[in-house]
Amino acid sequence: MAVGSTTTRAGEAALERLRQWPGEHRVAIGLSGGVDSSLTAALLVEAGWEVEGLTLWLMSGKGACCAEGLVDAAGICEQLGIPHHVVDMRETFQQEIVQRLVDGYRDGITPLPCSQCNRSVKFGPMLDWALQERKLPRIATGHYARIRHGGDRGRHQLLRGLDTRKDQSYFLYDLPQEVLGRIVFPLGELTKPDTRLEAARHGLRTAEKPESQDLCLADHHGSMRAFLDAYLPPRQGEIVLADGTVVGEHDGIEHFTVGQRKGLGVAWGEPLHVIRLDAAMNRVVVAPRAEAGRDSCVVGAVNWVSIDPIEAPRTVEVQVRYRSTPVRAELSPLPAIEADQQRERPHRCRLSFEEEQFSITPGQAAVFYDGETVLGGGLIQRE
């Protein structure tokens, strides 16, 4: 099917950026079967790029990462007249994402699988495949983020997408420079409504496809609880105050997260918040809000994206959850501990918040920003 003309200014601007892109216009597009990646492919084709579709097969069964996504991605490639390839990543996904996720919940942290998946399952392997198997110099995806090339000391800088409601830079902080330098994000300056309008104008079969509202593993199993129940048997334990006073019971610490207030099943004189998950004692530790705040946290395995590693404290805006509002904090370098010396990213920092924070969750990412630019990020550590 021929690609139609665009109707939005944002779509026209995206096409012009693609036409003016420096270097070779040859790319592998990561196709999930959703509207965002579908429109990305359509824009690249319309801009005159040589495009090949690539879908990563992550899980067996139904869902966006499985049969449904594969079928829709293949249909989009047929509609646009481009090749479609499928790479079986199920074993890697099971080892790198599923098992690590289960281990993290078992150990009392709340992992962030999406950033790890982007680094070790999606972008890295996708670029390797494009370069080695198809001799394609670039990869593209439908993420709402932007890249500025030739920034500080020649680095490839990651920027927020212009649509603040859809910005996905938080999940991309962990990508290395060698990958960022070869990525194309055509939707970085579009809004989601722009994307829907452009997809409809192009007559894409996915134009009205609803978005996934949860982690792909949760969608796959029906809910996050069902996913965890499939891997972790119930383990009854106590819900306690910080002084050890028992106030309730639970059937698994994996069903709780630091900062949680609702769904505790505890009757108390005032609302209680989860402040710690004690895996060794199989306890959920709770406290009133007045005792639940944190003024600092340690961030480990830091990946410096748009700047070199800092050597002195600096003020940043930091986001500690995907949907959280960025807050101001002082970012200070810490010496690497012995356990981190042999790691790929041994950098550690301390974040000191200007105002007390209430959902500082071990295992989640803390991503550092300077305005719209991602400086770097890492994983919140237990202390």
Swiss-Prot record:
Origin superkingdom: Bacteria
GO molecular function: ATP binding; tRNA binding; tRNA-uridine 2-sulfurtransferase activity
Subcellular location: Cytoplasm
Name of the top EC class for this enzyme: transferase
Positions of the record's site feature: Interaction with tRNA: H143, Q364
Keywords from the UniProt entry: ATP-binding, Cytoplasm, Disulfide bond, Nucleotide-binding, RNA-binding, Transferase, tRNA processing, tRNA-binding
Main location: cytoplasm
GO biological process: tRNA wobble position uridine thiolation
SUPFAM superfamilies reported in the protein's UniProt record: Adenine nucleotide alpha hydrolases-like
Gene3D superfamilies (UniProt xref): Adenine nucleotide alpha hydrolases-like domains (2.30.30.280), HUPs (3.40.50.620), Translation factors (2.40.30.10)
Keyword tRNA processing: yes
Disulfide bonds: C117-C216
Interaction with tRNA, as annotated region: 166-168, 321-322
Active site, UniProt feature: C117, C216
A matching Pfam family: tRNA_Me_trans_M
Sites where the protein binds ATP: G30, L31, S32, G33, G34, V35, D36, S37, L56, G142
GO cellular component entries: cytoplasm
Keyword ATP-binding: yes
Catalytic activity: S-sulfanyl-L-cysteinyl-[protein] + uridine(34) in tRNA + AH2 + ATP = 2-thiouridine(34) in tRNA + L-cysteinyl-[protein] + A + AMP + diphosphate + H(+)
NCBIfam families xrefs: PRK00143.1 (NF001138), trmU (TIGR00420)
Membership in a protein family: Belongs to the MnmA/TRMU family.
Function per UniProt: Catalyzes the 2-thiolation of uridine at the wobble position (U34) of tRNA, leading to the formation of s(2)U34.
Name used for this protein in its record: tRNA-specific 2-thiouridylase MnmA
Lineage per the UniProt record: Bacteria, Bacillati, Cyanobacteriota, Cyanophyceae, Synechococcales
